[in-house]
Amino acid sequence: MLAIGVVLGAGWALLRAHRRVVGQDRAWRVQEEAKARELSMAEVDELSWQEFELYIADLCRRDGCTEVVVSGKSGDLGADAIGYLADGRKLVIQCKKYAPHRSVSSQDMQKFVGTARLEHGADVALFVTTSRAFTKAALGLALRQDIVALHRDLLGSWVRGAHLETLIPLNGSGGGAKRRPFA
């Protein structure tokens, strides 16, 4: 009887150890997959606009968004991707893959403002770009209309692992001090 108890106890301990190791392995694999999806901003710049939209959707999924769908076409009425944040709020995303030196214009922002909530029912409207800045008029409009404006610097933070929900309150800030152009 004692021998059976010892064998069962050892078996139970081995089973628990096995489950713990399998769980640790699973967590490690998830982390490695996330690292493999992280790109440098130079690599992001090399993406086509379609690949950029898919990559933004992947970042959303990484951060717990669900039901993320990419339209993948023009004529999407300003919604390049739609999904739901972890807390259930509907997220509508406009992606603009512009050259880093370009600014997002007020006209681009106006189009998104006009459709994000009225057409798509966004609870959170996110405008993400590879350019360094939004024009003053575009950023002002975004702030007045509660559009999250994610420029290149904030996108870089997101790419490097910052969680989307930590970036939302920054809304266009974090661009650094304005510098005079080199003479």
State what each model feature region is.
Residues 1-77, 82-183:
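Mixed-charge (Asp/Glu-Lys/Arg
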